[in-house]
Regions:
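Active-site rim beta-loop-alpha module in soluble metabolic enzymes
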Residues: 51-108, 113
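Glycine-rich beta-alpha junction loops
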Residues: 43-46, 68-73, 109, 130-133
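Extended, histidine- and acidic-residue-enriched regions that form the cofactor-binding/catalytic faces
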Residues: 95-102, 106-125, 137-150, 158-171
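Short, acidic/small-residue loops that bind anionic groups at enzyme active sites
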Residues: 11-34, 116-135
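Short glycine-/acidic-enriched loop or helix-start segments at secondary-structure transitions
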Residues: 8-10, 49-51, 113-116
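Short, glycine-/small-residue-rich phosphate/pyrophosphate-handling segment
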Residues: 31-69, 82-83, 138-171
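Beta-alpha junction/loop-to-helix N-cap segments that form part of ligand/metal-binding clefts
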Residues: 1-14, 107-111
Length: 171
């Protein structure tokens, strides 16, 4: 899983069951438990893509800012990297400077930070992985599937030609 929800629309075209992105889940849940939130992600290069998703998901009214901690995802696993402190410091800035009421952790690698940060800062800190899993569980329990009318319709079968003709799927 990646917080930029890469391939989400393509996945919805391939399966009938519900498909939920981790950014999508996190920002929607954040908007349900707070009036405003900031996203704290890893690297600055991720910020434009996440700002685009905020717009795509209609959350621009709720999202105060997308912030980068400049912590590469693999540094999150290294206790000596200082990465966790940088993320904690960025969360503190988001709460004071952005005046956000909740924090969305903008990387799947931050999943294990949510509880501690929420307890420390006394605000909801949402991780997208857990959020997406719980939303999918809820959608399944409600008996809901991805609509196959128009936008997320299954792709039409294509006839293979030339050297790939023998690889044509049967059915």
């Amino acid at each position: 899983a990646c917080f930029d929800d890469t391939g989400l629309d393509a996945a919805r075209c391939q399966v009938a069951g519900p498909v939920v992105g981790i950014c999508e889940a996190a920002v929607h849940i954040a908007s349900m438990v707070s009036n405003s939130f900031s996203i704290v992600t890893t690297l600055n290069r991720s910020v434009p893509a996440l700002e685009g998703l905020v717009l795509k998901y209609g959350m621009e009214r709720h999202c105060r800012r997308v912030r980068a901690s400049e912590v590469p995802v693999l540094d999150l696993e290294d206790a000596n990297s200082g990465g966790r402190k940088k993320i904690r410091d960025e969360v503190a800035k988001a709460l004071s400077e952005d005046r956000s009421e909740a924090i969305v952790l903008g990387c799947a690698g931050m999943v294990d930070l949510a509880r501690d940060l929420s307890e420390e800062f006394q605000v909801p800190v949402i991780d997208g992985v857990t959020s997406a899993v719980k939303l999918v569980e809820s959608l399944v329990s409600l008996g809901l599937q991805t609509s196959k009318r128009n936008g997320y319709a299954f792709p039409r079968a294509k006839t293979y030609l030339g050297r790939f003709q023998s690889d044509q799927p049967s059915g």
